[in-house]
Amino acid sequence: MPRFLSQHEYDVVAAVADLVIAPVGDHPGGRALGVADYVDNLLGAFTVDPPLIFAGGPFSGRAGGDASFGDFLLLSRHEELAWRTRIEGSQGLPEREFNGPVRGYQETYRDGIAALGSDFLACDADEQLRRLKAQREFRTLFYVQACEGAYGAPEYGGNRDLGGWNAIQFPGDVQPRGYTDDEVARRA
């Protein structure tokens, strides 16, 4: 069950993920990579404590060391204010509007998904693309976050089964092992 989005909104985000990062050839596409999970975790980051903002570390455990990326870090009060403002918007709160009103990710997603239409999932791909192109603010934000979700650290909810890294032939995080001199020389 989604953390922030309704099931319909989640399904729309998954469909849009495949429009933006299409499944082509060996690339699985945005839906299969868990972009909707990443977006939902980001939008609902403050539904858990600590919030899903900064993954722990120093190691993921994928190349040795203790797996601690999944242990999210507490935020300072300034970090929390900044991230809540970014995600939730200023909401008329003086402490969030010192530079004026801020439209948050949550509002951008809710409005963008609604503007795509309640029948978006039933439309063919050409109509879905036409509608998505008409929603510039939503499309622009989504593109950035779809790339983060598809190719970022899987602890944030995306890059399912490391499929994004595999699709772009990225070996992923290698600490604490690191790279050998030979591996570095061959990549140059």
Residue ranges and their predicted role:
Residues 9-19, 26-188:
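Mature-region segments of soluble proteins
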Residues 6:
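Short, flexible, mixed-charge glycine/proline-rich loop motifs
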Residues 1-3:
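Short, Gly/Pro- and small/polar-rich lid/capping loops
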